[in-house]
A protein has these predicted regions:
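N-terminal helix-turn-helix DNA-binding module of bacterial transcription factors
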Residues: 1-60, 338-344
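Short acidic capping loops at alpha-helix termini that bridge into adjacent secondary structure
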Residues: 176-177, 208-212, 262-269
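Short acidic/polar active-site loop segments enriched in Thr and Asp
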Residues: 14, 60, 117, 175-178, ...
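Flexible loop/turn connectors
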Residues: 229-344
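Alpha-helical recognition/docking segments in bacterial nutrient-uptake
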Residues: 2, 60-168, 172, 233, ...
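Hinge/beta->alpha junction and helix N-cap segments in small-molecule ligand-binding domains
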Residues: 49, 67-76, 94-103, 145, ...
Length: 344
């Protein structure tokens, strides 16, 4: 088995330099890190922990790389994936990036060194080129977010249609001042959800300035709280909100409850995702329901099939879940207004 001493002898550097370079120590120059990693890859070096994993049998570990396990959306996916993979003799390993592409790269380096069987990833907005190369060398698929450089295997939600449907419901109720709180456009999911929001406004014959947008970290409850606080204090207060992530929804609901805002009498709200508490929050939250369990199960089955059949190359595969609008009591025509004819 190749050791750090072998790499050091090949490159003419010390063993400690090799170890620090592989650990991404900031004291080592980028040029030296590159030379060490390249030599390690060429020589088939496996790190100490990976070596322990690899003694005996080949890896049966599949990695799930996500932004934040505290987001119940991702924790539910992790649970369903783990359950399905365990039934097939595989184990799920979890890595969190906090939507930081450097953290993403660090995890992918480790996963590659550990020779995991495959990777399921919710990619950051702009993965490093090295991350792309590492993933291309592993069986992988993208989940929810889709980055063109990472291949064409993807499981996700029709984000455009989900937000178009949610916004169209508010337009049909007669709202003309609608605010959208969602993730940044640099994220594929954020861009598609914003596009769906704007599509519904256009289809409803509303002018561009009928919709206000507040884009920010999709996993930040604080962003939801601060944004809705600002919207309610400013001029031309919206009569309706449509939300583009679960964490933003949680933050908004917390702020509305704290301020005593009457929903839907003073403000209509359409959330995102369908957490257990959403059905009994206030009048019951109208929200975009997502088939998380079904999507995770399909994702696990695809990966298991891919690992067991080991095709010579992966053809494109896309699975799009439509989502649904769950109607409850948090939406109504604006005060002094009325729903359009045929509104749900």
């Amino acid at each position: 088995m190749i050791t750090t001493r072998d790499i050091a002898e090949r490159l003419g550097v010390s063993v400690s330099t090799v170890g620090r370079a592989l650990a991404d120590d900031p004291r080592i120059s980028e040029e030296t890190k590159f030379r060490v990693r390249q030599a390690a890859s060429d020589m088939g070096y496996v790190g100490n922990r990976a070596a322990r994993m690899m003694r005996g049998a080949s890896s049966n570990v599949v990695a799930l790389v996500i932004p934040d396990i505290r987001n119940s959306f991702y924790s539910t996916i992790a649970h369903e994936l783990s359950k399905n993979m365990e039934a097939e003799g595989f184990q799920l390993m979890l890595s969190e990036t906090d939507d930081d592409r450097t953290a993403e790269l660090r995890h992918l380096r480790e996963l590659s060194a550990n020779r995991v069987a495959g990777v399921i990833i919710v990619p950051t907005a702009r993965p490093h080129s090295e991350s792309v190369k590492l993933l291309r060398a592993l069986p992988h698929l993208q989940l929810l977010r889709r980055h063109p450089s990472l291949g064409s295997q993807w499981f996700g939600v029709d984000d455009h249609e989900a937000l178009r449907r949610a916004t169209a419901h508010l337009v049909a109720q007669g709202h003309t001042r609608i605010a959208y709180l969602g993730g940044p456009e640099e994220l594929p999911t954020g861009a598609e959800r914003l596009r769906g929001f704007r599509s519904a406004l256009r289809e409803g014959g509303l002018p561009d300035d009928a919709g206000r947008t507040a884009l920010g970290p999709p996993s930040s409850m604080e962003h939801g709280r601060e944004t809705v606080r600002r919207l309610l204090q400013g001029p031309d207060t919206p009569t309706a909100l449509v939300l583009g992530s679960i964490q933003l929804t949680l933050g908004v609901l917390e702020e509305l409850s704290g301020q005593g805002v009457k929903v839907p009498e003073e403000l209509s709200v359409v959330g995102f995702g369908d957490e257990p508490g959403f059905s009994w929050w206030g009048p019951g939250l109208t929200t975009t329901g997502l088939p998380i369990q079904e999507m995770a199960t399909g994702c696990a089955l695809w990966m298991m099939r891919r690992l067991k059949t080991k095709p010579s190359n992966d053809g494109p595969y896309t699975s799009v879940s439509p989502g649904s609008l769950v109607l409850r009591g948090s939406t109504a025509p604006p005060a002094g207004g009325k729903a359009r004819s045929g509104a749900a």
